[in-house]
Amino acid sequence: MALSSLLRSAATSAAAPRVELYPSSSYNHSQVTSSLGFSHSLTSSRFSGAAVSTGKYNAKRVQPIKATATEAPPAVHRSRSSGKTKVGINGFGRIGRLVLRIATFRDDIEVVAVNDPFIDAKYMAYMFKYDSTHGNYKGTINVIDDSTLEINGKQVKVVSKRDPAEIPWADLGAEYVVESSGVFTTVGQASSHLKGGAKKVIISAPSADAPMFVVGVNEKTYLPNMDIVSNASCTTNCLAPLAKVVHEEFGILEGLMTTVHATTATQKTVDGPSMKDWRGGRGASQNIIPSSTGAAKAVGKVLPELNGKLTGMAFRVPTPNVSVVDLTCRLEKDASYEDVKAAIKFASEGPLRGILGYTEEDVVSNDFLGDSRSSIFDANAGIGLSKSFMKLVSWYDNEWGYSNRVLDLIEHMALVAASR
């Protein structure tokens, strides 16, 4: 079941245009035509009406769009008319709050309840309304009582339970639960939500044992009997669409990824104890901190053909939001950097529009604040050393983009359920 809707909304927008993903196949050496519409030819020297340097790839003609950091995809009609998908949120941290904020601008999803044992309704309203990174909430929010918020005229119930099994999701009307506490990240732990009547749980973090999905890459492998799923990490959501396009067109033999990642809540404001990661205990605003990440290896879980071919690391830097992936890879097929750019641009305008972006502008990190796409390829930041070895650079709003994908995955799951 294809994903019917991908939200493209900025932090200041009240509109929610949507796009549709088209089917795409796995990389296959014997393919004549790839999932992106490229046909391999020994004689053609045209790409979408424009010459490319090697003359090896011929793409279907597409209508070009302006390649900017915040280009919005076109709106399409929803394919489901069974009402809004009812969602509950467990954990009102960065992702929980942004998932709720974005959901209020969507016409396909309604958040009906939020659980957080450490935040009461008044403080919840304050944290939701004011955001140092994404700005003040543009809608209305009121506290009705200790257990009820009113957001844009609609009520959201507030619960304060430490044990997920005690949250009465069914009574609250929530069928899908976003597990964004950062605590219950395994199937066994997240399954506690099912005891309260939730039908499905979406973990907003990597999971050791839950099926992992990246919208635009492998969400079509989701099955209705999967009750607990993971939306992977923000970095995997950035890297996987990029790797998918490059691997399907040219083949990736091996690659090393570095993410230059904005500060997150797990870091220290000043030097402090961090027994598992000594460097991670150093002051976040004072240092560039090398760190480990499983994001690159996780790509092998959503793209099995890349399993064991990618690994990587992170540098935590003193910026509040927006991160960037640097993928240095060796290709199986000879291709110039211009060829790779052309393939990514084509995908960004068609099969992966709204997920993968493309820009040739001289952008910096703040230009992607509030960008809902998972990955925006920076054509002028990368470089090729040879026809099989190159560095690719792609930006992502690690908060806003990721939170959009959480909701997109939920809606895809709801569409699959509705089609049965």
UniProtKB/Swiss-Prot annotation:
SMART domains: Gp_dh_N. It is an enzyme of class 1 (oxidoreductase). NAD(+) binds at R94, I95, D116, R162, N398. Its main location: plastid. GO terms for molecular function: glyceraldehyde-3-phosphate dehydrogenase (NAD+) (phosphorylating) activity; NAD binding; NADP binding. Disulfide bonds: none annotated. CDD domains: GAPDH_I_C (cd18126), GAPDH_I_N (cd05214). This is Glyceraldehyde-3-phosphate dehydrogenase GAPCP2, chloroplastic. The gene is GAPCP2.
